[in-house]
Swiss-Prot record:
Reactions performed catalytically: 5-amino-1-(5-phospho-beta-D-ribosyl)imidazole + S-adenosyl-L-methionine = 4-amino-2-methyl-5-(phosphooxymethyl)pyrimidine + CO + 5'-deoxyadenosine + formate + L-methionine + 3 H(+)
Pathway note: Cofactor biosynthesis; thiamine diphosphate biosynthesis
Signal peptide: none
Entry protein name: Phosphomethylpyrimidine synthase
Keyword hit for 4Fe-4S: yes
Species of origin: Methylibium petroleiphilum (strain ATCC BAA-1232 / LMG 22953 / PM1)
Binding site residues for substrate: 228, 257, 286, 322, 342-344, 383-386, 422, 449
An annotated GO BP: thiamine diphosphate biosynthetic process
Length: 628
């Protein structure tokens, strides 16, 4: 089977809609602005509408051909603004894809390269003197279609929530603590514009990624999650990475970073970008390092600049740039338990020490801003000196870099370049809030984007759990996007199942943070599932969960028959001791007698007391034995 057919076969595995779900759309002010949602139809006739990141892959009626890529949603919007130009772009060079491959790979890789070349569209860039960033438009009072799209997406369909959020006393009791965030009851396009203009939110949307469905990352919006994919020098293929992308967005990844460090970096990225409805981020220094044979000391500004333009032309939406790793800070890591653990950070530290000067990234930061604003690539200012163990959390190296990132944020904003700040890492629970406080203090409310943090270091194989604890906390405190951690963290490259486990763990963390912040409507899905649980609507419980497949599988391990899907008990308590069944019986008893539940409980207790006395007052009663 040739490579494209293999890709098509892989993707067919994840094209099924979720159970009882269908795609619906919120219509914007123009015919080409349609925001996808996932609607779950419940067995009681209700419909629950959910935020959807899966793109067209879960819509059965849409034909998907990975060799052609997804529809270009934003092309009409880009054309109307008339501030970009299509040009020839740089030529794809052999160096872009790294070292020569083994002979057994050559034919397959060459076919993938040819198909990827067909996928790549002629690139756009800003016209001379123009700035095409969403921040630039926002600061001029312009509401772009991307901003309206974000507003509709953040609000979703609110009608179904009224039943669950209409009890004013309960809502007052359960109201969240936004921890200083200013979350509106309804997100308007103008609110999105204002948040982007202030730098408190970004809309990562490169003009060369027209397939992207716009989304926002910001403290006053829903907490988002990022999933990492990418090949390495020792394992994984282009096909596997495209499949991981589709798999990741199925389970709820809002953004995906391609962290490829091995061969075929450019070609892998072509396949990913043209088939991605979510923003794609990269760490450009990884590819630049491949271009110099892995020797950090041989990196130059010219090579790095060429790599930035290469990736911007392909459509990468945000770059992790380790501009805060400065020569004066490197010695601060000498006494650490685990030193410098960031790959990008260690590359730049080695370069700085070798040349005994500030990094070319720091020195050329304004030149980088010129590239970013020509394509609307967002900065993700990397935490190259983040702590790699709890023992190193909140040290001077970490916070010295953070202060520098705050300074660079203001430089980026001078150019109207959208910017977010990356954060740790490994931080014990009692030290997490200090990270958020320091970031807000020094980085001027630019969105915070954290890897976890992991709260303990003794959980290899379970680091997705150890980090989801920290992620939920820092998400509540104000982090805008959480970078997932998989069970393979610190151990190996994640496979398909690891990706799912990491995403589900982080969807839990992000949702818990939204509920704690009191985000409007965040708790409605919980209430809908709780209602289904109380009414023993098992299929609805499964289908409203973050992972319907696992929920159903666990239930069916002990009660596999279809009849069990309508049973008023589960295998935990059995039919006689189900607390919810007992509660329902009390309510039925009260309704039959026209009394309150409290009165029913009192009457029931009196009845049982009378039966106890009539039976002789014995605690233990011998069972009747059938001698027949």
């Amino acid at each position: 089977m040739n490579a494209p057919d293999k890709l098509a076969t892989l993707l067919s595995l994840t094209r099924e809609p979720f159970p009882a779900s269908r795609k619906s759309y919120l219509q914007g002010s123009r015919s080409d602005l349609r925001v996808p949602m996932r609607e779950v139809t419940l067995t009681n006739g209700e419909t629950v509408s959910l935020y959807d990141t899966s793109g067209p892959y879960t819509e059965p009626g849409v034909a998907i051909d990975v060799r052609r890529g997804l529809p270009s949603v934003r092309t009409p919007w880009l054309d109307e603004r008339a501030d970009t130009e299509v040009y020839a772009g740089r030529l794809h060079q052999a160096l872009d894809d790294g070292a020569k491959h083994e002979d057994r790979e050559a034919e397959r890789i060459e076919q993938l390269r040819l198909d990827a070349a067909a996928l790549q569209r002629p690139p756009r860039r800003a016209r001379a003197g123009a700035n095409v960033t969403q921040m630039h438009y926002a600061r001029r009072g312009i509401v772009t279609p991307e901003m309206e799209y974000v507003a509709l997406r953040e609000n979703g369909k609110r009608e179904w929530m009224r039943e669950y959020l209409g009890d004013a006393p309960r809502e007052q009791r359960l109201r969240g603590n936004p921890m200083g965030a200013q979350i509106p009851a309804i997100v308007t396009p103008e609110f999105v514009r204002d948040e982007v203009a202030r730098g408190r939110a970004i809309i990562p949307a490169n003009i060369n990624h027209p397939e992207v469905e716009p989304m926002a990352i910001g403290r006053n919006f829903l907490v988002k999650i990022n999933a990492n994919i990418g090949n390495s020098a020792v394992t994984s293929s282009i096909e596997e990475e495209v499949e991981k992308l589709v798999w990741a967005i199925r389970w709820g990844a809002d953004n995906v970073m391609d962290l490829s460090t091995g061969r075929n970096i450019h070609t892998t990225r072509d396949w990913i970008l043209r088939n991605s409805p979510v923003p794609i981020g990269t760490v450009p220094i990884y590819q630049a390092l491949e271009k110099v044979g892995g020797v950090a000391e041989d990196l130059t500004w010219a090579i790095f600049r060429d790599t930035l333009i290469e990736q911007a032309e392909q459509g990468v939406d945000y770059f992790t740039i380790h501009a805060g790793v400065r020569l004066p800070f490197i010695h601060l890591t000498a006494d650490r338990r685990t030193g410098i653990v960031s790959r990008g950070g260690s590359i730049m530290a080695k370069w700085c020490i070798s040349h005994h000067r500030e990094s070319f990234i720091y020195e050329h930061f304004e030149d980088i801003c010129d590239i970013m604003k020509a394509y609307d690539v967002s900065f993700s200012l990397g935490d190259g000196l983040r702590p790699g163990s709890a023992a190193d959390a909140n040290d001077e190296a970490q916070f010295a870099e953070l202060r520098t990132l705050g300074e660079l944020t203001q430089v980026a904003w001078k150019h109207d370049v959208q910017t977010m700040i990356e954060g740790p890492g490994h931080v014990p629970m009692h030290m997490i809030q200090a990270n958020m406080d320091e970031q807000l203090k020094h980085c001027h409310e630019a969105p915070f984007y954290t890897l976890g943090p992991l709260t303990i270091d003794i959980a290899p194989g379970y680091d997705h759990i150890a980090s989801a604890i920290g992620a939920a906390m820092i998400g509540w405190f104000g982090t805008a996007m959480l970078c997932y951690v998989t069970p393979k963290e610190h151990l190996g490259l994640p496979d398909r199942e690891d990706v799912k486990q990491g995403i589900v763990a982080y969807k839990i963390a992000a949702h818990a943070a939204d509920v704690a912040k009191g985000h409007p409507g965040a708790r409605a899905r919980d209430d809908a599932l709780s209602k289904a649980r109380f009414e023993f609507r098992w299929m609805d419980q499964f289908n409203l969960s973050l992972d319907p497949d696992t929920a159903r599988d666990f239930h069916d391990e002990t009660l596999p028959k279809d009849a069990s899907k309508v049973a008023h008990f589960c295998s935990m308590c059995g039919p006689k001791f189900c607390s919810m069944k007992i509660t329902q019986e009390v309510r039925d008893y009260a309704a039959q007698r026209g009394v309150s539940e409290a009165q029913a409980l009192g009457a029931g207790m009196a009845e049982k007391s009378s039966q106890f006395r009539q039976a002789g007052g014995e605690i233990y009663i011998p069972l009747a034995v059938d001698k027949g």
